[in-house]
Amino acid sequence: MNNSSELIAVINGFRNSGRFCDINIVINDERINAHKLILSGASEYFSILFSNNFIDSNEYEVNLSHLDYQSVNDLIDYIYGIPLSLTNDNVKYILSTADFLQIGSAITECENYILKNLCSKNCIDFYIYADKYNNKKIESASFNTILQNILRLINDENFKYLTEESMIKILSDDMLNIKNEDFAPLILIKWLESTQQSCTVELLKCLRISLLSPQVIKSLYSHRLVSSIYECITFLNNIAFLDESFPRYHSIELISIGISNSRDKISINCYNHKKNTWEMISSRRYRCSFAVAVLDNIIYMMGGYDQSPYRSSKVIAYNTCTNSWIYDIPELKYPRSNCGGLADDEYIYCIGGIRDQDSSLTSSIDKWKPSKPYWQKYAKMREPKCDMGVAMLNGLIYVIGGIVKGDTCTDALESLSEDGWMKHQRLPIKMSNMSTIVHDGKIYISGGYNNSSVVNVISNLVLSYNPIYDEWTKLSSLNIPRINPALWSAHNKLYVGGGISDDVRTNTSETYDKEKDCWTLDNGHVLPRNYIMYKCEPIKHKYPLEKTQYTNDFLKYLESFIGS
């Protein structure tokens, strides 16, 4: 006898000939010969059954008629060394039987088979199965597959078998793979129609109501399975009082603008949520120290340096919807770098910076409206400055800190409205080169330089400004001090990434936990090596339906955009 496989083959031969068999598994009219010792060694169920006086020691039969005969037979063959022959048709029966008999290796083999073959065609079936038998591993994997393929599944014949509890779980999930929230009510209505079940308020609460278009809200109002329920209409009548909703992960794209290590080109990167990686989607020739503003999903890059030693007045843009560069944009009124960039609903603003002629600081703010042939003067800051933080909040332009005359930082905070400039509570410390973001009605700044005299100290400070109370609050510091990092807000969280730390480009990112007031290094948003991220913008997907007039079959029209 050379090895265990030969021994198993011999024992299986004994079983087939009935030699030394001391137990019969009875399933209805079928019988399976076996050995108690062999079954006990492979199955926890049989081990307990045969050793704890559950049956008489002289008993020769065990009745398992509540189990599927073919599955039990396949598993006993498996115990005796015959490989399982798994298919999509039999794997569920074999797995549930293996789970009952507690045959660990067979359970693992069945689970691995399902996970390997999981797809949009079988994920609902396996999800319902896993939920019934409380298999968390398969339930989680099949649920994620449903989320990823949800718009394919709304016409699947198994879609109607999902329970209301499952639909609430699906429609509530941040990872639901829809690029526009208007598709969530479509998913709900398709399920209601397939089950002929009336809507409930619990289902409506899963929708991000504040993100829905008026056309889709009207479609909900008018649908018979919604309008017939008084509680649902009452809920929809009060949506104006609901809190603002945050977009789902797939309804926005994180687009970063920076300089790559590939000959220092401008690089546009997109975050892949599925792979948890940044992927370069476009690049162009080198430029640095430029300002960035985003309007209508177009990223504008203003001024800065190109490959010459002189500052530039050129403005270029990248259209995230068409994945194309735009070059025919009017130039700035004069070359400048280290300026601030902002946008409101109509205009792009270029703020302050360093002029090319004599490297002097400028206080001018210019604005440009897309389709207009030139930039126009808008205002002047109280003092010339560069490398300041800028933010647009409640229709006001805020200018924060920056470098002023003498290469020193300032702690000034001012806002510009139609009535002119207004001073606000000063920063707790003089700062420049920090990142700035508006989040949840406040202005947040992080990193940069801070010093009262010469600009030379890299900061890890994070501050928030409340415009209602006109006060600054110091938050937990970054783990890594950095200048000119990118600060962005997505899915109700704050992130900071990139920048320069200790004169070296850093590819690290950090996430802020508001409840714990702490920053955590974020392995999921690590940047490409030697990549300076100037700005990161959540870009909301746009669809032509947003300008479409409402009709009675609007949801059917919406469905035609699936896959586009």
From Swiss-Prot:
Top-level division of the source organism's lineage: Viruses
Keyword annotations of the record: Early protein, Host cytoplasm, Host-virus interaction, Kelch repeat, Modulation of host E3 ubiquitin ligases by virus, Modulation of host ubiquitin pathway by virus, Repeat, Ubl conjugation pathway
Subcellular locations according to the entry: Host cytoplasm
The keyword Repeat is annotated on this UniProt entry: yes
PROSITE patterns per the UniProt record, alphabetical: BTB (PS50097)
GO terms for biological process, alphabetical: symbiont-mediated perturbation of host ubiquitin-like protein modification
UniProt domain BTB: residue ranges: 21-88
InterPro entries: BACK (IPR011705), BTB/POZ_dom (IPR000210), Kelch-typ_b-propeller (IPR015915), Kelch_1 (IPR006652), SKP1/BTB/POZ_sf (IPR011333), Vaccinia_A55R (IPR024182)
Keyword Ubl conjugation among UniProt keywords: no
GO cellular component terms, A-Z: host cell cytoplasm
Kelch repeat positions: 252-297, 298-346, 347-395, 397-441, 442-492, 494-539
Main location: host cell
Annotated function: Probable substrate-specific adapter of CUL3-containing E3 ubiquitin-protein ligases which mediate the ubiquitination and subsequent proteasomal degradation of host target proteins.
Quaternary organization: Interacts (via BTB domain) with host CUL3.
Record note on domains: The BTB domain is responsible for the interaction with CUL3 while the Kelch repeat domains supposely serve to recruit the cellular substrates.
Protein family per UniProt: Belongs to the poxviruses Kelch family.
Protein name: Kelch repeat and BTB domain-containing protein 1
Species of origin: Vaccinia virus (strain Copenhagen) (VACV)
